[in-house]
Amino acid sequence: MKRLLLAVAGLLARLWGVLPAGLRRRLLFGLFVLEGRAGNPKRGLSNLFGIEQALDLAINERAMAYGGAEHPKHRLTRYHDFFVERVPDGARVLDVGCGYGAVARSVARARRQATVLGVEIDAGRLAQAQTADNPPNLSFAAADATRALPPGPWDVVMLSNVLEHLEGRMGFLRDVLATARPQRVLIRVPLFERDWKMALRREVGANYMSDPEHFIEHTLAEFAAETAAAGLRIEAQTTLWGEIWADCRPVGI
């Protein structure tokens, strides 16, 4: 079915491409204007925000194709450096919700004496992580991190775009601290305050999450409150590329 849909999309794209680029853009803009004027301004804004979200999905799909199955954001935002720079060589590192293993791979390559384990619940992502060109100090395992984690102690726990996918975040973080017993927890989450349109999206009732599987996209205040309630102290934090990057320690360490 997917192959058929892609074939149909390819055919339609070729037909659409026959039209001059300027005409295509004017037609699309005209449709957006009409959609924004369907109903009152609040409804029109909600409609346009829905289109913007769909366009973001299309852009991300093309970005993955452009990047050869790896999203260019890894290269352009250099967020991997945030994790690499905070992992000492020789450390035991647990990457929770490692996805395709991109961050874990960067850390393992840069810190050859470290031992890095990535855990992931999604079988497809895990398989891709395991079959990539991985250094010998990196391994992957299947795990539902909300139910069981590899026991510690781990020197560093990495949570890159994980917390926003969880409803019981504070309980999860407490479990991580109790089971993994880390000295340091490195966290990356999307920031709600990245754009004024996020607040307007919420105000008009449009979706303001960057992923339909997100339960939250933190404000700075929410992130500070949740980490503190879980028993973490923020040692250093930066906001960049619409995200919060935080270097945390368990309280008492």
Regions found by a protein language model. Give the residues of each.
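Conserved acidic residues
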Residues: 91, 155, 183
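Hydrophobic adenine-recognition pocket in adenosine-nucleotide-binding enzymes
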Residues: 162
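Short active-site alpha-helical segment characteristic of glycosyltransferases
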Residues: 223
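Conserved class I S-adenosyl-L-methionine
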Residues: 186-208
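A short glycine-rich, Lys/Arg-flanked "PGG" loop and its adjoining helix->strand segment in the class I
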Residues: 171-184
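Conserved N-terminal segment of class I S-adenosyl-L-methionine
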Residues: 2-152, 171-173, 202-203, 213-216, ...
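A conserved beta-strand element that flanks and buttresses the S-adenosyl-L-methionine
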Residues: 158
